[in-house]
Amino acid sequence: ILTEGAKHVLGWKSPHYVYHCAYNPNLKILLRDFKLSDDISLRFSNSDWSEYPLFADKYIGWIAGLPEEEQVINIFMELSALGIAQPLSSNILQFIKALPACAKEKGISFSTPFEIVTKFKSVDQVDVPYPMSWADEERDTSCWLGNVMQREAFNKLYSVAGRVHLCDD
C-alpha cells in the first residue's frame, strides 16, 4: 500500500522505512514523505518559498543528508504537478530530468514499490484506521466532507449501499 506519511498516523516514526499493516503483517506499507513530495509538486515554482529556486543537486543533497539508516524516501505526487501545478516555464521537466544524474553522484538509487518491499523488511506496524488524503494540511477527508452539502451528498450515496449490494446485474 502507498499512503500518506501523516504525522497523526506516524507519531514519532519516520516515513523512511517499510512498515506493515497492523491487521495483516504480509501487507507492506510505503509512506509518502509529504515535505519532500510537496517541495516539488507545490512549492517548486513559488518565488516566495525560502528554498526557491530549487535545483536537482540541492534537492538530492537534502535526501543524501538524511540519516543513513533511513532506508526509503517515497516521493509521490500527482502527474498534474508536471506542467499544470508547476508550469513548464518553471523548468520543472529539466529539474526532473536532472535528478537521476545528481542521485547517482550521491550513491542514491531509484526503485519501484515492488523492489522496495522485496529488498527491505518491515521495521514495525502502522495502523491507519481512517481514510487519508494529501489534499490539505489535515491529511484527511475534511476537504471533501467539510461542509453540510458535501456530507449530505456523501451520506445519501452510502445510504443506498445495501440496495446496490442486492442487485445482481
Spans of features found by a protein language model:
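Conserved beta-strand positions
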Residues: 2-3, 77
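Extended, H/D-rich, highly charged conserved domains that either
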Residues: 4-17
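Active-site and substrate-binding clefts of carbohydrate-active enzymes
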Residues: 16-39, 45-50, 54-169
